[in-house]
């Protein structure tokens, strides 16, 4: 009997010890969750106060950037707008906080104490010093789809101010019509029945394309289009391939992307160049191509009129890529894609 009693007592002791460990484990997890909620609540409150402070500074110092009748509303809306990820985070922690209150019955466990609130200046110091910002942050900002970056702006201006005006058919003056008229008049054939736009990674294209395979020919018929009260000429150069492909001589309407040339000039100019432009020029090059391609393919009037060719200006051996060979390769569907070039 004594032995049996000892066994029972030992079993009870083991169960009691396991119960204590389980209790302390649950308490540790609960305390961790409560502390996390307090930290998030403190950060949110500090961020809200910082946003309100910035509203006051913006209203007092930069009011000229807003119309008087809606200045306050726009400043508040811009300052107090949260992105989707922040909203999801706040809602998630609110749900966890309500769950903890329902379990413990004590809302004080998830409310920030005075000790937590006194830590808010640390968040303000962190924000004012922009400790989370780096050059990589600029890269991610350029890649986002907001239309405010340099690359998207150049692509949009190029598309709306040039391609969308000069290429679609209006009164028998569109690109397709002019290509057909050129072929009939000169008894030639275009290798690519679109306007070919070159986008090299150097962002520079000579005024006359240099290639031992290309000879400059007569340009397409010039268009004159009224733009802001001025009849502006729109021209497209034509080049003849002096090497026969499949027994035929082909012509190409081809030109460089002029916004990229302007960006090249701006980057290397002492007046406008910055180290950020130098550092992120490849990001801008790729974003320009992607955004321009999206605009061209989305707009019904231009999706079949432009052929973008993005390429590295030098091959793996450091030799300059020949534009004529590039056109032949593209015509034969061997041009590298943007993903291959990026890698």
UniProtKB/Swiss-Prot annotation:
GO biological process, one term: positive regulation of macroautophagy
Primary residence: endoplasmic reticulum
A single MF term (Gene Ontology): 2',3'-cyclic GMP-AMP binding
Pfam families linked: STING_LBD (PF15009), STING_TM (PF23417)
Record's bilayer topology term: Multi-pass membrane protein
Residues reported to bind 3',2'-cGAMP: 157, 232, 235, 255, 258, 262
Subcellular location: Endoplasmic reticulum membrane
Induction: Expression is directly activated by Rel (Relish).
Keywords in alphabetical order: Antiviral defense, Endoplasmic reticulum, Glycoprotein, Immunity, Innate immunity, Membrane, Nucleotide-binding, Transmembrane, Transmembrane helix
Annotated glycan sites: 84, 187, 270, 333
Residue spans crossing the bilayer: 87-107, 109-129, 195-215
GO cellular component entries: autophagosome; endoplasmic reticulum membrane
Similarity field: Belongs to the STING family.
Role, per record: Facilitator of innate immune signaling that binds cyclic dinucleotides produced in response to infection by bacteria and/or viruses, and promotes the activation of the NF-kappa-B transcription factor Rel (Relish). Recognizes and binds cyclic di-GMP (c-di-GMP), a cyclic dinucleotide messenger produced by bacteria such as L.monocytogenes, leading to activation of the peptidoglycan recognition protein (IMD) signaling pathway and activation of Rel (Relish).
Protein name: Stimulator of interferon genes protein homolog
